[in-house]
Amino acid sequence: MAVKNIVAVDLGASSGRVMLATFHTATQHLTLKEIHRFSNTLVFQDNHHQWDLVALERDILTGLQQIDAMGIAPDSIGVDSWGVDYVLLDKNGQRVGLPYSYRDHRTDGVMAAVTAELGREAIYQHTGIQFLPFNTLYQLKALCDAPPDDLDKVEHLLMIPDYFHYRLTGNLVCEYTNASTTQLLNLEKKTWDGELLDYLGVPRRWLSDPVQPGHAVGNWTAPSGRQIPVTAVATHDTASAVVGAPLQSRDSAYLSSGTWSLMGIESDTPFNSPQALAANITNEGGVDDTYRVLKNIMGLWLLQRVCQERDIKDLGTLIQSATTLPAFVSLINPNDDRFINPPSMHQAIRDYCREHGQPVPQSDAELARCIFDSLALLYRQVVLELGELRHAPIRQLHIVGGGSQNAFLNQLCADVCQIPVLAGPVEASTLGNIGCQLMALGAVTDLAAFRHMLTHNFPLHRYTPRAESDFAGHWRRFQALSQPETAPQGKKETTQ
């Protein structure tokens, strides 16, 4: 019986993992084994928030070397990560400059200046990408407007997963789904937008033409001497998460729930109408020539920060305490600028509630309840916006990722959105990464077959909406808070 061993390196904005999948082609049985899990934390150095790429590479190699020591020769390796962030290389392939994080404040005010100069409508018609102040477009504008002394040494720009593929193989490849997050890819041509690059002053030699998921990057030489193929998967973690979401129909929306919440639909065509622009909808690249028509939501970053600041270790107890409190007492707009990276998240939430004349949450449980209620209401808003764009209602929501383990938030989402919710699998990004590799190897015929296989290997949990008698008033309150929408400052992830 043919067996495929696949390695997925899944890098998130707060953690990473090296996972080994074993797929039996005859029985369609897929198992996952976690080889190495590690943290990914921002480093504040030289007055900027940066990624510790050296530590990430060390952890990636630790996982791969452990697999090699087990005597396993994987059929393929693939890396996915968050979007928008990049690495600059010189002609010798050495890093140039700092590996900035999207949460760094160097882009503050840049998006406003660029859109004032070029016009939101023109940028959106070119790219179809939502306006987020940390998009690569604005990161590069900040870089080129205040160029470091060594900028003239730059020969190549790689997105984060492309950089690690390069470190494994020595080959420079730019993958499409992550490239689409930059707001520099032409929506129609699916290649770099020359006008935007010229505006920034970015030489075109920095950027190679994007390749589609499934592209063979090269080989990694393992300590044993084995040559292991490396495949460009859907390298944006959300793109992989969508592959790993067993959507049941085109009337289903997905919600990749983690540090960021990313909600959207799969579409054969992009949506870049004035209505889509007004809703700040993005059209990121997907697999099989699809578009991920979606919206970024601040997500569980809010809760993660509160737990960190308040030294909360027992998340289960916190959630249980929140369930006992009255609903919708204090509400925030999770996508308000102030929540991207405040000095104190719990204080930012309290200040917001105070400024809007609401009860100020004091206890940890009250803060959590405020976050959960507000996220569910924002999910409802995006579900309605997506339905209006496609001229057909969303009939089911599929939640994947780490946040899909939060049964309370899942049920709250079903209740507020008034549609059934399916939750799982948890490791959707990892599974989507694996799916891209299996399809590239011909072990799975297509995306539909892969998703069908997932439903037989990973249990899904269904949440049926319940009626809320006094919901209309809470919904009006939230709409007042969220209009006009303020886009989140500063990802990312999730992510984005």
Swiss-Prot record:
Reaction catalysis annotation: L-rhamnulose + ATP = L-rhamnulose 1-phosphate + ADP + H(+)
EC number(s) on file: 2.7.1.5
Residues reported in the UniProt entry to bind ATP: 13-17, 259, 304, 402
InterPro entries: ATPase_NBD, Carb_kinase_FGGY, FGGY_C, FGGY_N, Rhamnulokinase
Cofactor(s) named in the record: Mg(2+)
An MF annotation (GO) of this entry: rhamnulokinase activity
Enzyme class: transferase
UniProtKB keywords: ATP-binding, Disulfide bond, Kinase, Magnesium, Nucleotide-binding, Rhamnose metabolism, Transferase
Classification via Gene3D superfamilies: 3.30.420.40
Residues of the active site: 237 (proton acceptor)
CDD domains: ASKHA_NBD_FGGY_RhaB-like
Recorded metabolic or biological pathway in which this protein acts: Carbohydrate degradation; L-rhamnose degradation; glycerone phosphate from L-rhamnose: step 2/3
GO biological process: glycerol metabolic process; rhamnose catabolic process
Record GO cellular component, one term: cytosol
Binding, substrate: 83, 236-238, 296
Cystines in this chain: 353-370, 413-417
Entry similarity comment: Belongs to the rhamnulokinase family.
Known function: Involved in the catabolism of L-rhamnose (6-deoxy-L-mannose). Catalyzes the transfer of the gamma-phosphate group from ATP to the 1-hydroxyl group of L-rhamnulose to yield L-rhamnulose 1-phosphate.
PANTHER family per record: L-RHAMNULOKINASE, SUGAR KINASE
The name this protein goes by in its record: Rhamnulokinase
